[in-house]
């Protein structure tokens, strides 16, 4: 059936035909035409794929509490991992036929990783990104967002940018690595 999951902590909504959720580990797997909406101020980001998966970032990196012994004073300091309830302690992955839509840009790729910690979309397997009159391609594309808006892009291996200037005039840039910035 149709399932809707709203996470008010990180401002996301998942709509899918089928959802498997583990409330203990806070992992969610969505299939059958899943759609994730990342709520932003004026321009939300919509991500669709064959499969969406989301979980705690600290589980991915196995963040643990640590114990440190102070050899000078002979005391023990315990550092507790408080990321378990942090709203930025989330990531999501999208697999197969990934599509990203927003008012300012669109993208397609085969698979994607997004971390709420650094607000970076990592696009893999033949990614293509469109913004206004520009198209960017490469083997891997990192899309960095700042204040919930597209800020800059890093393109790795086989970078290519096409930018339309006039109806019959285009800029074309090809390189092994590219850094591009968005401006209003």
Feature locations, PLM:
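Structural signature for solvent-exposed beta-strand/loop edge elements and short helix-capping sites
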Residues: 1-184
